[in-house]
Amino acid sequence: MSERKLFTSESVSEGHPDKIADQISDAILDAILAKDPEAHVAAETCVYTGSVHVFGEISTTAYVDINRVVRDTIAEIGYTEAEYGFSAESVGVHPSLVEQSPDIAQGVNEALEAREGQSDDFNVIGAGDQGLMFGFAIDETPELMPLPISLSHQLVRRLATLRKSGEISYLRPDAKSQVTVEYDEHDKPVRVDTVVISTQHDPEVSNDQIRQDMIEQVIKAVIPAHYLDEKTRFLINPTGRFVIGGPQGDSGLTGRKIIVDTYGGYARHGGGAFSGKDATKVDRSASYAARYIAKNLVAAGLASKAEVQLAYAIGVAQPVSVRVDTFGTSTVSESILEAAVRQVFDLRPAGIIKMLDLKRPIYKQTAAYGHMGRTDIDLPWEHLDKVSPLTEAVAALSEGA
């Protein structure tokens, strides 16, 4: 009998409390970068019933109306009714932002390499902190993402579309999805075993109506029919009621959905969150670079699955380590792939920032529905422009091996 395994990932909607916080943090970052691309930003947000607290460290020459940015973001998400317990125009906004520590700034503004006399423009910026970051790609989906997280994101995005268009009028902003995929003995996805959708709703709608709409207008509209069968389970609002939601039901905090933001648990995670951080913070920029590398490796046919680890020391430009793991799927040795990666990609913070053009206000759009594998927006770390350079570098290194 062939061995089959299950793997589960989840996603949450833009109206989930933690995602509200992420979007506010990134909206503040974007507003600052639009006026001052050289700004250093670390903006954290906490939301709960009737209140938003914004705190952190910012070094900038720009003035931004934090209060207005917060309220506009909340309204765009859909919290505009007082009965939700959290409304854009009535919520209390409490900013508490200070300047970045000069001890940190001296290492970011002038890397160790520059202080030691290594004259190179890309040695100017040091990593904003120590840490390890992962990027991943796999050939399970056209966007080279694991299927469980891809489907989970699509479900909550579909919910948001139906809510904002008014097609399903009883929907409220908070929602979660979870998809369990069954894999065969070759680790290939064969079917969807279980789908969970929990969606906030108006009080008068029946559970039967919600279930019918979720199955017909959300699940079957998103998940390809060949993955669904008579044994697939649909668990819709399993508690039986989800009227109280958003920050009225749970507090939210920036950086608490790091697995949703990346690969749904299918790949490793270095632990650093993304939202509210400018690109000198390698938690964010190096994670994007690692995804860029992994995706181009898989797209080039050099592996069917690739995980890239990068690691940095605070105030140092060059990564302290670069590792490529292809889980036995590569067409050449991993040492050759690592050497090719070092040739093709400049992985110093300034190199990553230039390569991916990260001083632009592009971050708020990433703060819900995943930072990786997005097909609805154009993100530079999802581009496949390094396929040819990687292929050529691997060929040259293989000849010399």
Curated annotation (Swiss-Prot):
Cofactor(s) needed for function: Mg(2+); K(+)
Main location: cytoplasm
Gene Ontology molecular functions: ATP binding; magnesium ion binding; methionine adenosyltransferase activity
Annotated stretches, region: Flexible loop: 100-110
Record pathway: Amino-acid biosynthesis; S-adenosyl-L-methionine biosynthesis; S-adenosyl-L-methionine from L-methionine: step 1/1
Class of this enzyme: transferase
Annotated positions binding ATP: 16, 174-176, 241-242, 250, 256-257, 273, 277
GO BP, sorted A to Z: one-carbon metabolic process; S-adenosylmethionine biosynthetic process
Enzyme Commission numbers on file: 2.5.1.6
Catalytically driven reaction(s): L-methionine + ATP + H2O = S-adenosyl-L-methionine + phosphate + diphosphate
Positions contributing to L-methionine binding: 57, 100, 250, 281
Binding-site list for K(+): 44
Compartments, as annotated in UniProt: Cytoplasm
Residues at which Mg(2+) binds: 18
Any Pfam family the entry gives: S-AdoMet_synt_N
Highest taxon, organism lineage: Bacteria
Similarity remark: Belongs to the AdoMet synthase family.
Physiological role: Catalyzes the formation of S-adenosylmethionine (AdoMet) from methionine and ATP. The overall synthetic reaction is composed of two sequential steps, AdoMet formation and the subsequent tripolyphosphate hydrolysis which occurs prior to release of AdoMet from the enzyme.
Quaternary structure and interacting proteins, as annotated: Homotetramer; dimer of dimers.
UniProt-recorded name of the protein: S-adenosylmethionine synthase
Organism the protein comes from: Streptococcus equi subsp. zooepidemicus (strain MGCS10565)
